[in-house]
Design a protein with these regions (language model features):
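Surface-exposed strand-loop junctions at beta-sheet edges and helix termini
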Residues: 25-26, 31-32, 51-52, 62-63, ...
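N-terminal Rossmann-like FAD-binding beta1-loop-alpha1 element of flavoenzymes
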Residues: 125-150, 303-312
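Glycine-rich flavin
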Residues: 92, 98-113, 117-126, 139-146, ...
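Short hydrophobic beta/alpha edge segments that flank linear recognition/processing sites
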Residues: 32-50, 69-84
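Glycine-rich Rossmann-fold phosphate-binding loop(s) that bind the pyrophosphate
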Residues: 129-133, 155, 297-300, 330, ...
Length: 587
């Protein structure tokens, strides 16, 4: 009889309770090594757990909606030969601060002497990828006296964030806010006519914003004498990269390299992606048209931000999410005000529901749902795929340089951003979650400074997250869900924005500010906010946590009044028992 292998969730750092969004196999299925078994979902990305070896699935211990941690049994596999080793981590999981990525098992090749390298161009530092992390690394290295080459496959610097992500989405979200605020001013006696949306002008304005920023980056590169090469780069050795450019192939040699290759949109297999009515976030930001009925597949940050834009522009929105709540990375009480608002604005919000099939028809996209009410169908004019992103680590031929890339495309690094090859570093999306531009830029400066001989390493206590929805949601440090899962004793203070003079004056009092404090030390553990401009407010909480502030420190810091920023101050006063703006009965 063939041995039975227990396949368990690998090391995913300190974070627990990762959600299972799909089980991809069933008992009796034959799988090959590296076939995906289950899909897990974090804040902004999905991760698959692969089979450690070929075999036949005997039993399955998980179902969609379950929460798992390291060591949770996924399934048993009947496989020939000895039991396979545990699978390696699909990716580092998001947590209050950056999670430790698995250290490479063995060092890679050392840098070759300069005299042995034949190349068209030689640089002390090559940066592969020019997103927020890449250009920051290049500019910082140049400022520290290094000769730098920056390789980018697209014509414009800035990567996904600037060109097809953070910046264009915020431009459109701003205009969406203008539309909705004008519409909702009627309750105060100010009535505007229905807005006329000139889609071509709106698109041109958005593109103009991007143009200013990309032009600015090009200027900054020239000022620093950073050589920019436009083309697709791949490693050919531990000291060389081949770049396919419009003028031909160029070989670039380097003493040190920083990989900043980013990530790509994840897709659910089996859908007719050749149909232009199925779009991803990049397609949604092109603003080709405003569909009458739009399906958002994925109730995370990216999907809900795009839903906010298209709802304001006039689309009837349906959101479908496999889990039992929106924005899985945030606490449910923080998401609730957003959920209540969009329930009134959107056509449908389908939770615990799977998109089983999409059929391209002449009159629209016929979508089959499987959910609590059984199997249903509906017709949409467009469907936005927003189920996360995948790292680009496997697109670089990193193996030619000896760089370790795990099965999901992540490149493990240490706290100085080093890969297993000592002179090659990795930053941003490609080296682990959370996939956020501000994480990438922080890592970029660390890598550049280490290369320049500085004593730098990643020691940030938290990486804040923001959903730029309406209302916005922001959180940092430990969430309450994480604190409970880790058995941490804490005190919670929640200040409702209904008691905030500024929130009431703006007509948006549905928000709240929540702060968690360590029960013994009284230091801030985490904070979350939902409400107008929550993304602008969370930075104070980040600074407080980084500085080791406790409830007393925050409550004794004089805040301007009336502001939304004082809601964190009020939450700290609630924790201290000194608040006068609310009556809190003594315990």
């Amino acid at each position: 009889m063939n041995p039975t292998v227990e396949v368990k969730v690998p090391d995913i750092g300190d974070f627990k309770n990762i959600l299972v969004i799909e089980v991809l196999v069933k008992p009796g299925d034959t799988v090959s090594a590296e076939d995906s078994l289950v899909t897990l979902e974090s804040d902004k990305a999905t991760m698959d757990i692969p089979a450690p070896s070929a075999g036949v699935v005997k039993t399955i211990s998980l179902k969609p909606g379950d929460k798992v941690s390291m060591g949770t049994l996924i399934l048993t596999l009947e496989a020939p030969g000895a039991a396979a080793p545990a699978v390696q981590p699909a990716s580092p999981a998001p947590a209050a601060a950056k999670l430790a990525t698995p250290a490479p098992a063995a060092p890679g090749p050392a840098a070759a002497p300069k005299s042995d390298i034949k190349a068209d161009i030689h640089a002390e530092v090559v940066v592969l990828g020019a997103g927020p992390g890449g250009y920051t690394a290049a500019f910082r290295a140049a400022d520290l006296g290094k000769k730098v080459v920056l390789i980018e496959r697209y014509p414009s610097l800035g990567g996904v964030c600037l060109n097809v992500g953070c910046i264009p989405s915020k431009a459109l979200l701003h205009m969406a806010k203008v539309i909705t605020e004008a519409d909702e001013a009627a309750h105060a006696g100010i009535t505007f006519g229905k807005p006329k949306i000139e889609i071509d002008k709106l698109r041109a304005w958005k593109d103009g914003v991007l143009g200013k920023l990309t032009k600015g980056l090009s200027g900054l590169a020239k000022q620093r004498k950073v050589k920019v090469i436009t083309g697709r780069g791949e490693f050919t050795s531990a000291n060389t990269i081949r770049v396919e450019t419009a003028e031909g192939t160029k070989t670039v040699a380097f003493d040190s390299c920083i990989i900043a290759a980013g990530s790509s949109v994840a897709k659910i297999p089996g859908f007719p992606y050749e149909d232009p009515r199925i779009i991803d976030s990049t397609g949604a930001l092109k603003l080709a048209t405003v569909p009458k009925r739009m399906l958002i597949i994925g109730g995370g940050i990216i999907g809900l931000e795009m839903a906010t834009v298209y709802d304001a522009l006039g689309s009837k929105i349906t959101v479908v999410e496999l889990m039992d709540g929106l924005i899985p990375g945030a606490d449910k009480d923080v998401v609730r005000p957003l959920a209540k608002r969009i329930e009134k604005r959107y056509e449908k919000i389908l939770l615990k529901t799977k998109v089983a099939k999409i059929e391209a028809q002449k009159d629209g996209l016929k979508v089959t749902f499987e959910g609590p009410n059984g199997t249903t169908t509906d017709i949409f004019d467009a469907a936005l795929m927003a189920v996360g992103r995948r790292p680009n680590g496997r697109e670089l031929k990193a193996e030619a340089a000896g760089v370790t890339v795990n099965e999901r495309g992540y490149i493990p690094v240490d706290k100085q951003q080093r890969t297993n090859v000592p002179h090659i570093y990795a930053i941003g999306d490609v080296c682990g979650e959370p996939m956020l531009a501000h994480k990438a830029t922080h890592e970029a400066k660390i890598a550049a400074e280490v290369i320049a001989g500085h004593k730098a390493f990643f020691d940030a206590k938290t990486i804040p997250s923001v959903a730029y929805t309406d209302p916005e949601i922001a959180w940092m440090g430990l969430t309450e869900t994480q604190a409970q899962a880790q058995g941490i004793e804490y005190d919670k203070a929640v200040f409702p924005w209904a008691a905030s003079g500024r929130a009431l004056a703006t007509g948006r009092d549905e928000g709240l500010t929540k702060a968690l404090f360590d029960k013994k030390s009284r230091r801030l553990l985490g904070a979350a906010m939902v409400g107008v401009n929550a993304g602008e407010l969370i930075a104070e909480a980040v600074l407080a946590l980084e500085m080791g502030a406790d409830a007393t420190d925050i409550s004794l810091t004089i805040h301007p009044h009336p502001t939304l920023s004082e809601t964190l101050f009020f939450a700290a006063e609630m924790a201290e028992g000194s608040i006068t703006d609310l009556y809190v009965p003594k315990k």
